[in-house]
């Protein structure tokens, strides 16, 4: 699903494209791609896979926009007159790998083709359009791979009825095949009435139409077919739904489950009186993303990927307004809960008593039978003891059939803690929103069965050219380590303080201070300074006398600081820890200075860039400025000759794949800055070095955030320094205890038989 997914067709095919009859007997699409999940851009055999000299060019290849290779790679020319149509098609059937300005690279994968057929594209339509756009004759390997990946889609549905999950299919033989799998068989409930001859529940369902070749690029919504079909189904355990969906994916049984919600014909769940306001006008790319979600009068579960600042909130509110059923909206923290509640009221006609917040500080309920609840992932997934009021609210959430489960920053869902949310709540349709569909633990592909396929992904550079998001100048500022700091950095005994040493590098501090002064005084910009290292965050903020927000900052104080940053002319810089990475809306900010980060996290780099991607000024002014008119700036300060250089290169990879480039700056601060900046003298630098070395290891590490549990604010694991901590005896006391277990009653442990003791100790017990 994400950029990390590299499975694709190879030339080791079991049969040629002519043997179409065998296609009907395909059970496992794994036969069509290598078992190894390697990156095709590296490794052995690269030259062999890259040799496409046998591809046959079409006579009019100059008029066609893309190259389709036998290994599943597709290259798109962005300067082609057909670029826009080709991009809309490719983003529906393939995974983007790298999208610089002139040439895009995509991969055909089983999951991308699963997503394609889920939005209504037929197998033959995919092959036909891909062949029309390709400069070469479409390789037989790709044709076979498309057939294998899409052959079984739509044969199995996952349906929610009265808080019970059913696997439904018009083909009883398919259900038998699924039940032959141990995982699915163990998940089956056998208490259903009205069995057919095969032991399945028999019912009726309305049919549907699929998109044809002529309707592919027009995105026209098709009407639902009126024909009714006989369906067979069996019930499964709600706690095992995740396992069942995973087993049905293309890399397993290859019967990907169709999750669609026929909300217009749902007469069981009450309707929510909610419409979009007249001023809520979705942009073209927002409309396109919604058209991928809605078709045939039904809502599909899946993921929409839009850059930060591109209007994901409006997409989410629009989806909820179109379904008009109860909606559960999940965010990452209490600040974003407030922002989502505000967005619902801003863009829709929902009444104040129909929307409520559920956080550790605010436990509200909506009035009536239907409404919107905005809460955090932690509040739902928390497994500890709750207050009586919170327990009642959670129980209501568990028992309710939600029309829409709206998940912001959906890339966090694969985490063990957050994925429990999917099984705790029951919803007909799931929509995930994110800007960065990447994770360093390779769990991003789990979203295929936790949520659904990727429905749409926007191209960042296209939105920049359209003036929909800011045009950002990215720069990496190289800060040489001072002699004293570098000497301590190289010492083995300081291994736990290496990060603190290169973050607190005096030259990095001076560069940071210079950039803040330049952008505040000469440009009048609003600046965010990011630091994962809590020790550095505190030292920088106190030295420069700027407000800061970190894990232990109360919700009230956070709100006050952010409000002052947005409205006050005197508060132009704010320091943020990693709590500011996600879901904090600061549209006024247009400069980011990053002084420390979380190792090589590509997602964090993109999320932080997203804090300044909100479009600035009027659309006409942005368009008139041209692509070279930068209106936002992203600085990553790196201490040279340290581990930070390696991490910085890795972190930038996602943004480079989106078409961004990083300018390297080696002369900050300028030589004439002199003593006007802090830590100019060697005495000041040595004093700072002593402070870093004398701090405890727990004080100079990364900020560790606790779970946002019920009744407890988001806090950090931090303690005040003391002499006992310096000696290594912090929190330790002397006490005696009896390690032997006492038996029930007054009987004590019987003494050991002296004859069974070791010879050395026998004489002591004579």
UniProtKB/Swiss-Prot annotation:
SMART domains per UniProt: DEXDc (SM00487), HELICc (SM00490)
One Gene Ontology MF term: ATP binding
Region (Disordered): 1-56, 739-766
Family: Belongs to the helicase family. RAD25/XPB subfamily.
Motif (Nuclear localization signal): 749-765
Cellular component terms (Gene Ontology): nucleus
Taxonomic path: Eukaryota, Viridiplantae, Streptophyta, Embryophyta, Tracheophyta
UniProt-recorded name of the protein: General transcription and DNA repair factor IIH helicase/translocase subunit XPB2
Binding site for ATP: 306-313
Catalyzed chemical reaction(s): Couples ATP hydrolysis with the unwinding of duplex DNA by translocating in the 3'-5' direction; ATP + H2O = ADP + phosphate + H(+)
Gene assigned in the entry: XPB2
All copies of domain Helicase C-terminal, residue ranges: 510-676
GO biological process: nucleotide-excision repair; response to UV-B; transcription initiation at RNA polymerase II promoter
Inducing stimuli: Higher transcription in light than in dark.
Domain Helicase ATP-binding: 293-455
Pfam families: ERCC3_RAD25_C, Helicase_C_3, ResIII
Biased composition regions of type Basic residues, renumbered to the chain: 757-766
Location(s), subcellular: Nucleus
Function: ATP-dependent 3'-5' DNA helicase/translocase; binds dsDNA rather than ssDNA, unzipping it in a translocase rather than classical helicase activity. Component of the general transcription and DNA repair factor IIH (TFIIH) core complex. When complexed to CDK-activating kinase (CAK), involved in RNA transcription by RNA polymerase II. The ATPase activity of XPB/ERCC3, but not its helicase activity, is required for DNA opening; it may wrap around the damaged DNA wedging it open, causing localized melting and twisting that allows XPD/ERCC2 helicase to anchor.
Keyword flag Nucleotide-binding: yes
Annotated TM spans: none
Main location (coarse class): nucleus
Main enzyme class: isomerase
Tissue localization of expression: Expressed ubiquitously.
EC number(s) recorded for this UniProt protein: 5.6.2.4
